[in-house]
Amino acid sequence: MATKVKENEEADVEREGAPDGPLLDLSDDAVKKMIKAAKKRGYVTMDELNSVLPSEEVTSEQIEDTMSMLSDMGINVIEDEEAEEAAASDDDDGADEGESEGGELAPASGTALAASKKKEPTDRTDDPVRMYLREMGSVELLSREGEIAIAKRIEAGRETMIAGLCESPLTFQALIIWRDELNEGQTLLREIIDLETTYSGPEAKAAPQFQSPEKIEADRKAAEEKEKVRRTRTAANDDDITNVGGEGQAPEEEEEDDDESNLSLAAMEAELRPQVMETLDVIAETYKKLRKLQDQQVEARLAATGTLSPAQERRYKELKDELIKAVKSLSLNQNRIDALVEQLYDISKRLTQNEGRLLRLAESYGVKREAFLEQYSGAELDPNWMKSISNLAGKGWKEFARAENQTIRDIRQEIQNLATETGISIAEFRRIVSMVQKGEREARIAKKEMVEANLRLVISIAKKYTNRGLQFLDLIQEGNIGLMKAVDKFEYRRGYKFSTYATWWIRQAITRSIADQARTIRIPVHMIETINKIVRTSRQMLHEIGREPTPEELAEKLAMPLEKVRKVLKIAKEPISLETPVGDEEDSHLGDFIEDKNALLPIDAAIQANLRETTTRVLASLTPREERVLRMRFGIGMNTDHTLEEVGQQFSVTRERIRQIEAKALRKLKHPSRSRKLRSFLDS
């Protein structure tokens, strides 16, 4: 049968390739093997094709015939295993980067096939922007249905993780602590729950149930139309950011509308606090009932008497479902959820370390890994486990139990302490950790897909903010951070497309980063908003009066204090580098023309040097003792002056004698023959 298939394949090749004598030698075993493998896969790579092509000169007709023959056989010729992704990326980037894809094959040797398709990809790998764009282009855009599907996966993963956390007693212990902290005023409500999601959650979730599809579609179109208008307005005001290097702002009217429509965080807290406290009280009461059943379950495992009765199991499930429903209604802050997950993972890590120590000890005595796991699984808290393994007939069990008796007991005691800390059995704890990990993994994968599919949106927005103090890749990075926040907060039930929602977050992240990082001297965001407002008003008045407005006119127009306007205009100026070239030849810098207030002027330096020299000559005309006394008393040529007592100690005489020597020396200096030389310095 295999021989017949091979003969059919060769017949196909001979029938399709015979007319012009194609490049492939069909009698060659390597060619036959390559074609057979290519038919199974549906493609052949350039490297594989080049390895079987002849090395002599060939015509373009032969190359075209070979490519056509392979195509007719259902075999695609690709560059490499990842060529399809690269091709998709090249299609997206080709217009921007001026690349020519799929050009005509030139007459050459067999390697010419690869040369025509491998031109650009290897040349542009050094440019990180092009590499990023190429990889980004390999991801397909999402449709509206695709966005909803991924959003549902994110929601399902998060709910799985929350459900796992709700089965852990540690979660409810933390919730009770947070409730007490709220009552005592030690923490804010916004630190425990997501205020915006909790405040708008019920209305948002109810929308699909109580609104018709036509109404939802109409609202969505109205929102998109409003977004287009807002983008147009923002584009008209984009130049404001260029002038001040700050954050782009929408028109003032829109800002005022947003302020009116959004409640403050304090108002949200005041409105939600009673409801949240009531929910936390319900959780605390329900958990007390559940805790009793969990304690009974752990005691049953420790006593090796089995599990709960069927009635207790049903009651346990009912209480657990009530708690899960109550916790979901809270919309916990993501930071709090992360803290709960981290707590679970930390205990799981300690449990794994102890069990790993126990396994390694057993293996050191020749116990098989599979045998150990078979005996250990399900008996983590069994008090009779030591007795049972010491009676096993398998290799190493008796030696292991006898030699490491105390170590085994210590490790199992630590494991039992972990079970007591978690409030549930080890098997149940492992199941909860696995459930949380599964939900977190599913949500993370779905979020990654949503982010990667919308990277083009970040590029399109970041292009508008170039040349404003940050490099293009930095803008993309900040925009991607905003995109990830948008994915975390996206609510598909509202009926809007993700791009409509994400645009605000991306623009906000980019403009905030420009405000924080673009300027050498950082200006607060609220001050940048004031600068933008003044710049817009100044441009408007320029069109009205035909000249730049004065600070007084701006203050009157904006109803702002004159001093504040002047202060803002002064702040808006960009710092200039002292290394800025000056002149056409650029051989001097701006710093060369700035006066140094601390530097000594040349004339003053000359006068000081002349005074020092003249004083030295005049003092040299006195006796050595008189000269030294004057120098020490007045600090001439020394670090500091000296008192009469200090000078007297140097010469081993009294203070009075030093005073007399000083007075005599000063009288000598007042003589016209000496004073005449120093008098000229008084005028200077």
Curated annotation (Swiss-Prot):
Its main location: cytoplasm. Residues 618-671 are annotated as: Sigma-70 factor domain-4. A motif (Interaction with polymerase core subunit RpoC) lies at residues 474-477. One of its GO terms (cellular component) is cytoplasm. SUPFAM superfamilies: Sigma2 domain of RNA polymerase sigma factors, Sigma3 and sigma4 domains of RNA polymerase sigma factors. Keywords: Cytoplasm, DNA-binding, Sigma factor, Transcription, Transcription regulation. GO terms for molecular function: DNA binding; sigma factor activity. GO terms for biological process: DNA-templated transcription initiation. Residues 1-26, 83-128, 203-262 are annotated as: Disordered. Residues 83-102, 250-261 have a biased composition (Acidic residues). Signal peptide: none annotated. Interacts transiently with the RNA polymerase catalytic core. Sigma factors are initiation factors that promote the attachment of RNA polymerase to specific initiation sites and are then released. This sigma factor is the primary sigma factor during exponential growth. This is RNA polymerase sigma factor RpoD. It comes from Rhizobium meliloti (strain 1021). The gene is rpoD.
